[in-house]
Amino acid sequence: MKDCAIARAKEAGAYNDGDAVIIMTGANQGIDLTAKAIINKGDKIIVENPSFIGSLNAFRTYECELLGVDVEADGMDVCKLEETLKANPDAKLLYTIPTFQNPTGTTMTLEKRKRVLELASEYNLLIIEDNPYGDLRFNGEDVATLKSMDTENRVIYCGSFSKILSPGMRLGYVIGPAELLEKVEMLKQVNDVHTPMLTQMMCVQFMKKYDISKYIEKNRKLYKEKCQCMIDAMEEYFPKGKVEWTVPDGGIFLWCICPTIEDIRPVVDKALEKKVAIVPGTNFAIDQNLPSNKFRLNFSSASKSDITEAVKRLGEVLNELL
């Protein structure tokens, strides 16, 4: 299984000789245990705002201080990152999803990634690079991972098989400098001893028997069709001029903004009455007590006909409430 993880990571330039590899029960376990190994109570952790709720909650568990940096159309605002580091030079860790970010679907440019690494070097910052969606690009060219450009052993890379094979498999991995991952490996043993062998064997046999690259390419084409289907439906059914959204080059998310309102929750509640679930922006925020006029859509699981129907129902709600 480790060989499979290394093979996938090498394609992203995310494995170096001397790196340690730990197989995880889902990439989120890797983030949680890595955070547990690194974070002490009161530490300052820099995260994108908004960011993945699972990771934010993992960090909160360890009673750290979360410092949010806004996400722009081309990824994290590196000017704000620099300001945050100047104000908090003792920050210990940066957590980022640079490719097809959750929830915004945005991708950090190569220039910004280089700047992130420069700032990490200047302020002696560790980085967790969470890359579960990197294989799901359906437009444009790949952007080099932070790990592939790291020359100072600062980046801990978290990858996933769940997103390319089956979400229910809960199979991921962490790659990083051996000295950084020693404690993570111990915590993994305490947590669940090891990732279920049956799941690992299924993944290994699949990758031996089939061409994983062709399988991923098939999924990319499907996600591209579903993404376009969702965008087409939004253009048809959403109120004109009252909803803005990202257009991702990959991944599984669309991020929507309703600039004419302050709080999306009435829309969320009304949509649920029509059996349409959307995730409010508050769920991904550093301060979840503040209202948000944003919401996330996911096009990965539903059929194209269901996507169209769901967006139509959501459009009815938006036309009523906006």
List PLM regions with ranges.
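Conserved core segment of the aminotransferase class I/II
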Residues: 151-221
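PLP-dependent enzyme catalytic core of the Aspartate aminotransferase-like
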Residues: 273, 289-322
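Conserved glycine-rich beta-strand-loop-beta hairpin in the small C-terminal domain of fold type I
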Residues: 204, 220-231, 243-257, 267-269
